[in-house]
Amino acid sequence: PVALQAQEFDASQGVTWQDMNDDAVDVVLDHIATVDARASAIETAAGLDDLNRAFIEPAAAALAEKINRDGLKLYQDIPYVVGTGGTAPSSLSDLSDVRRALNLNRAPLTGRVAVWDAEADAKLTQLPAVVNAEKAGSAEALREGSLGRVYGIDHYMSQGVWKHACGLTAAEAVKVSDAVSEGATKLSIDGTKLTGRLVRGDVLKIGGRSYVVTEDSAAAASNAIGGVSVYPALPALADNAEVTVVGGHTANLAFHPMAFAYVTRPLANPD
């Protein structure tokens, strides 16, 4: 969206014009989701109702599931994390932490959404503040098993939520191995024990901020990994700054829908 700034008007200087630049992002449409099925001549001669039941409906469901999984896999591009890896959220404070992260990252207040895996959903739908109608104002969570809207976020469950496996097999006393200049998007790390490699979607915490690894790194050699690509850009970091590697975790997502775009177009007609 166009971003403008409000300023104090100075009659002696007059109007200060701002350009209304609407940023654009190039999107490469290079993925085609397909459901291929083989049918005999007798099967293709079946009535339309049978064709719907045997192919069209299950094919549509398979495509929807793939699109859902592909969308949830965008967690690999998100650096902002809360909670403890390997521990399902189970309290109102966990939900409050999610809201805080959205607030700090200036997500619009309306339309916020969270998608939880089955384990987190089971924990959160047991919260007394959600289940008890006299507290929540509704018995929907108890009757329908739906968390609903809590802390300004619409909550949903999906079996398609990904489980992220950290690429490192050992990481002890990890630190920045060379000073980093402000604005850099690469850094090198070492530790007393560092094996494996960092993979896309791994998260590093440095100086109270978190950064996501944007591409697989080289394998660790002599307890060090160089040229690790991360997002967002780094501040100036001193050599030996402490690094916390977030371990394997379930990649539940909380976001505003405008954070992502689903882009599609009709297939070209065959000649």
Which residue stretches match the model-derived regions?
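Beta-strand elements of well-folded, non-transmembrane domains
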Residues: V2-L4, A41, Q159
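Short linear interaction motifs
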Residues: D94-S96, T185
